[in-house]
A protein has these predicted regions:
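Juxtadomain low-complexity/linker regions and immediately adjacent membrane-anchoring helices
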Residues: 1-9, 52, 112-114
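Gly/Pro-rich loop segments of beta-rich domains
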Residues: 2-33, 60-95, 122-157, 184-212
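Short coil/turn segments that connect the beta-strands within blades of beta-propeller domains
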Residues: 42, 103-104, 165-166
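Short loop/turn segments immediately following the C-termini of beta-strands
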Residues: 49-50, 59, 111-112, 121, ...
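Structural signal for beta-propeller blades
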Residues: 52-54, 114-116, 176-178
Length: 215
């Protein structure tokens, strides 16, 4: 007899299984095209990608359709838009798609700003700006590959990230590669290993051919 698991909680949609688009104005309970999630003993963190923000709940909510406790990337739960609705990239997001909490720090793949944002502690206050980033020279910069050629310290549409065996892995989608740092950096630093390309300066589809080692 098949086993059908039921969700413990539902968040975002107005009803379980609801498919309607959220209201035009975002709230602390609504989600629009979420693409990334993280859960540990302290936080539930969701990339609310379509609203260009990160929502955080303190632990697993105790009821359905619960309001988030913290919002990052927007001035309030009612604001939306890339780069905080035009405020600027220093404290704004453009399509966040991946999230990891490691050693008390929050890492977010800010895909269309071509960077990984880092908070040195998981914020418990809304609209807290990130402390630094990987993939750009500063929090004000948003050009793909830092506005120059592909390199070990540049990113183009980083859609996913993970910490595995103490090493940071980033899916650098636009450059058709995976970058790996030997450890988890505490400042902007070049990657140590590349998968899917022959070297750190290449970004061709399938390395220009098709095979097992290609991305």
């Amino acid at each position: 007899m098949p086993c059908r698991a039921a969700p413990l909680r539902w968040l975002g949609a107005p009803a379980p299984g609801g498919l309607a688009l959220p209201a035009a104005r975002p709230t602390a309970t609504q989600l629009y095209a979420p693409r990334g999630v993280w859960l540990d003993d302290e936080w539930l963190v969701v990339c609310d990608s379509g609203n260009h923000r990160i929502l955080l709940w303190r632990g697993i909510p105790d009821h359905d359709h619960a309001a988030a406790d913290v919002v990052l990337g927007q001035k309030s739960f009612e604001d939306e838009g890339p780069a905080a609705g035009g405020r600027g990239p220093e404290n704004g997001l453009h399509l966040p798609t991946g999230v990891v909490v490691h050693a008390g720090r929050l890492f977010v793949a800010d895909a269309w700003h071509h960077r990984i944002l880092v908070w040195d502690r998981v914020p418990d206050v809304s609209d807290t700006p990130p402390d630094w980033c990987l993939g750009q020279a500063s929090l004000a910069a948003v050009e793909r590959n830092r506005g120059r050629g592909v390199s070990a310290d540049s990113l183009y549409w980083p859609y996913g990230l993970a910490v595995i065996a103490g090493r940071l892995h980033v899916a650098d989608t636009g450059n058709r590669r995976v970058l790996i740092w030997n450890g988890v950096p505490d400042r902007d630093a070049p990657a140590d290993i590349v998968l899917g390309q022959p070297d750190m300066a290449s970004a061709d589809e399938n390395r220009g051919e098709i095979g097992r080692a290609h991305v």
